[in-house]
UniProtKB/Swiss-Prot annotation:
SUPFAM superfamilies: N-terminal nucleophile aminohydrolases (Ntn hydrolases), PRTase-like
Active site as annotated: C27
Cofactor(s) needed: Mg(2+); [4Fe-4S] cluster
Species annotation: Synechococcus elongatus (strain ATCC 33912 / PCC 7942 / FACHB-805)
Pathway field: Purine metabolism; IMP biosynthesis via de novo pathway; N(1)-(5-phospho-D-ribosyl)glycinamide from 5-phospho-alpha-D-ribose 1-diphosphate: step 1/2
Protein name: Amidophosphoribosyltransferase
UniProt: Mg(2+) binding residues: S315, D377, D378
Gene: purF
Lineage of producing organism: Bacteria, Bacillati, Cyanobacteriota, Cyanophyceae, Synechococcales
């Protein structure tokens, strides 16, 4: 293992210096099998494209037969890796990960990929998602005297693979066994000495795509959380890995089979609304185009008599353009985003916090002065930063501020890999629209309906998980977890 020097990256910032006022993604995974290529460098670029899915830590494991080298650390991909480190990571198979965690679990031990030694050799695992039976799995492993070194469910899946191998199963059987023991959301990329594996849970809640890269007359296979990870290395998108599907990639090519007994798609609709990059495809559909369509639908459902339409950078912009197009109202770039504000700047004073919104977004006074504006955003979670944003717009001279949200109200927490608050902290779970309108200080507020959100997709509307909007969870949540939103991140041995 290459020695690392942990980099502190423990400050949260967005629209002010508090936690972002929207759900936060948990992870991005990227892997490829490409003998003769610089797989670590390719994985680096893939993770760089997936940086929006996790900014806390990053890691890459590289295999050459039974030999594996791993480098992971706290920080952004560009902070964790440099040319010298990548040069040391030589091999034919790479598994990479970029991570966002919930509060309290920000430590190097939880960075991925998870790496364990088994009877058949090393296994490296990268995971996007969250299990809901983590307490049960953890207790089972501790009862067998396994020494757990992290507070992640990803380590539990890796240990389940190790146990199955110890019982005599081959890699394929062991990975399938671990998947069957795991309940919840998981998209996995797994490196072993003999193959690269990729799989999704039976509901396919978290995304995983397959791509190909032509090199020296050979077809190489790539796995990524999003197609933008394929684009950056020049790989072609082939298809999404199906719910409950597993693929195995070796020198012989690609094998695919369904390990789940009755897969039932329940894709995370928030991937389409916000999480995934707008230049990615979601099951073959352009997310930029989808977000423009939901903006158009929002304009139909909740028009506004205004002079200008603005989008909250960056995620609110496509919907704002669609809203503007549908109503024939000019779209304006009235908010300038400072793209160099991140999670590693100096701790602010309280006075800085009170005016901190301008560290990330600065209104253009000459655009906004004397104008009635509609501001479009993808979601409201707590309402804290929305209130600050509205105040900043009024201070810049806007005479009216009407807010439109391109998703339904978030009323329930996510248990499948998205960092949301407990239900009592979700503003739409405890307040009416009129109360939220008053609290954040807008002249009017409206949300896209759930029907409008789903009808704008090209997928069957029954194929989505919409639990954060209606509480209908596709995978049963244990009551003790539902009451407290106690995920493994907060469990200690």
């Amino acid at each position: 293992m290459i020695p690392t020097q942990p980099l502190t990256a423990d400050l949260d910032c967005d629209l002010g210096l508090e936690r972002p006022d929207r759900p936060e993604e948990a992870c991005g995974v990227f892997a490829l099998y490409a003998p003769g290529e610089e797989v670590a460098r390719m994985a680096y670029f893939g993770l760089y494209a997936l940086q929006h899915r996790g900014q806390e830590s990053a890691g890459i494991a590289v295999f050459e037969g039974d030999r594996v080298m791993l480098h992971k650390d706290m920080g952004l991909v560009s902070q964790v890796f440099d040319p010298e480190i990548l040069q040391q990571l030589q091999g034919s198979l790479a598994v990479g990960h970029t991570r966002y965690s919930t509060t309290g679990s920000s430590r190097i031990a939880n960075a991925q990929p998870a790496l364990l030694e088994t009877r058949l050799g090393p296994v490296a695992l990268a995971h996007n998602g969250n299990l809901v039976n983590t307490v049960e799995l953890r207790q089972e492993l501790l009862a067998k005297n396994h020494e757990l070194t992290t507070t992640t469910d990803s380590e539990l899946i890796a240990f389940a693979i190790m146990e199955a191998v110890a019982e005599g199963q081959d890699w394929r059987g062991a990975i399938e066994s671990a998947c069957r023991r795991s309940q919840g959301a998981f998209s996995l990329t797994i490196g072993t000495p003999e193959a690269l594996y990729g799989t999704r849970d039976p509901n396919g809640i978290r995304p995983l795509v397959l791509g190909t890269l032509e090199s020296n007359g050979q077809t190489r296979y790539v796995l990524s959380s999003e197609t933008c990870g394929l684009d950056i290395i020049g790989a072609d998108y082939v298809r999404d890995i199906a719910p409950g599907e597993m693929v195995r990639i070796t020198d012989a090519g690609l094998e695919s089979w369904t390990w789940a007994e009755a897969p039932q798609p329940k894709l995370c609709v928030f991937e389409m609304i916000y999480f995934a990059r707008p230049d990615s495809l979601f099951h073959g559909e352009s997310l930029y185009s989808y977000r423009r369509r939901i903006g158009q639908r929002l304009a139909k459902e909740a028009p506004a008599d205004v002079d200008l339409v603005l989008g909250v950078p960056d995620s609110g912009i496509p919907a704002a353009i669609g809203f503007s197009e549908a109503l024939g109202i000019p779209y304006a770039e009235g908010l300038i985003k400072n793209r160099y504000v991140g999670r590693t700047f100096i701790q602010p004073t309280q006075s800085m916090r009170e005016t901190g919104i301008r560290m990330k977004l600065n209104p253009l006074k000459d655009v906004l002065a004397g104008k009635r504006i509609a501001i479009i955003d993808d979601s409201i979670v707590r309402g804290t930063t929305s209130r600050k944003l509205v105040k900043a717009l009024r201070d810049a001279g806007a005479t009216e501020v009407h807010m439109r949200i391109s998703s339904p109200p978030v009323t329930h927490p996510c248990f499948y890999g998205i960092d949301t608050d407990t239900q009592d902290q979700l503003i739409a779970a405890t307040r009416s629209v009129s109360e939220i309108t008053e609290q954040i200080g807008v002249d009017s507020l409206a949300y896209l309906t759930e029907q409008g959100m789903l009808e704008a997709t090209r997928e069957s509307i029954g194929n989505f998980c919409t639990a954060c909007f209606n509480g209908r969870y596709p995978i049963a949540i244990p009551e003790e977890i539902k009451r407290s939103k106690l995920m493994l991140e907060t469990v200690t041995a």
